[in-house]
Every structure is written in structure tokens, then in C-alpha cells.
């Protein structure tokens, strides 16, 4: 059996359409009619797939800040290394946690949307 180049292209297009239909088939199963409103007009039997993009977490902020109720807390900087020769009094002042300033918490909520 000999198939011409033109027929191969047509068969390829049909296979492509079938593969797209097969991908959408599980999404379309179970509902007989879709209603879509576009520019004030109502279309029946039109299927649309909408994908909502996710907001990204700022990883540097996520490693430094933790959420506590409505605000955020962080550790105090300056205790990790290079502390030889420092007095115990000055090092003790760098212990504990700090609460975020209310003006900065809106910015932190944007950087950490899922925390």
C-alpha cells in the first residue's frame, strides 16, 4: 500500500486533533453543557480551561521570617560567626526575637503568600 505525502500530512493532522481531544476528554466528561460568557454574549457547549498562576514565595524571606498570628517574627542578626572577643553582655543583647514593624508586614505578606 502506497501513501502519498499529502495523505500523510492529512493523517498527521487528524492524529494531532485526536490527541488534543483525548487530552481534554477527562475534563469534558461528566458535564453535558458548558456556558461561557464572552463580551456580554452567552455561548453554550463551549469548553474552556482556565489555569490560575500561583504566587511565588520569596525564599530568602521564608528562611528568615516566621508568621505569628497577624504579624511576623525573626531572629536578631549578628550572632552567627565572628564573635570572638565580644563581651557576653553585647552578645546577650543580640539574643531573642524581633517582631516586624506594622508598616513592613504588608510587604512581608506579599513576599510570603502561603505562610
UniProtKB/Swiss-Prot annotation:
Q: Where is the transit peptide?
A: 1-53
| Result after altering residue 11 to Q | In strain: V1-09 and YJM339
- Localization (cell): Mitochondrion
What is one process in the GO biological process aspect for this record? mitochondrial translation
Top-level division of the source organism's lineage: Eukaryota
Recorded family membership: Belongs to the bacterial ribosomal protein bL35 family.
Record's protein name:
Large ribosomal subunit protein bL35m
Q: Which organism is it from?
A: Saccharomyces cerevisiae (strain ATCC 204508 / S288c) (Baker's yeast)
The record's Gene Ontology cellular component field reads: large ribosomal subunit; mitochondrial inner membrane; mitochondrial large ribosomal subunit; mitochondrion
Record keywords: Mitochondrion, Ribonucleoprotein, Ribosomal protein, Transit peptide
Quaternary state and interactors: Component of the mitochondrial large ribosomal subunit (mt-LSU). Mature yeast 74S mitochondrial ribosomes consist of a small (37S) and a large (54S) subunit. The 37S small subunit contains a 15S ribosomal RNA (15S mt-rRNA) and 34 different proteins. The 54S large subunit contains a 21S rRNA (21S mt-rRNA) and 46 different proteins.
Instruction: Sum up the protein's function in the record's words.
Output: Component of the mitochondrial ribosome (mitoribosome), a dedicated translation machinery responsible for the synthesis of mitochondrial genome-encoded proteins, including at least some of the essential transmembrane subunits of the mitochondrial respiratory chain. The mitoribosomes are attached to the mitochondrial inner membrane and translation products are cotranslationally integrated into the membrane.
Q: Which residues form the signal peptide?
A: none
One annotated GO molecular function is:
structural constituent of ribosome
Q: Where mainly found? A: mitochondrion
Amino acid at each position: 500500500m502506497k501513501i502519498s505525502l499529502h495523505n500523510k500530512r492529512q493523517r498527521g493532522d487528524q492524529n494531532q486533533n485526536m490527541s488534543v481531544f483525548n487530552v481534554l476528554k477527562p475534563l469534558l466528561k461528566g458535564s453535558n453543557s458548558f456556558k461561557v460568557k464572552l463580551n456580554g454574549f452567552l455561548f453554550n457547549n463551549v469548553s474552556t480551561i482556565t489555569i490560575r498562576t500561583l504566587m511565588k514565595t520569596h525564599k530568602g524571606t521564608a528562611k528568615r521570617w516566621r508568621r505569628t498570628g497577624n504579624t511576623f517574627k525573626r531572629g536578631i542578626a549578628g550572632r552567627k560567626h565572628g564573635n570572638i572577643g565580644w563581651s557576653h553582655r553585647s552578645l546577650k543583647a543580640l539574643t531573642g526575637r524581633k517582631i516586624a514593624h506594622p508598616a513592613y508586614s504588608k510587604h512581608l505578606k506579599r513576599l510570603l503568600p502561603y505562610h
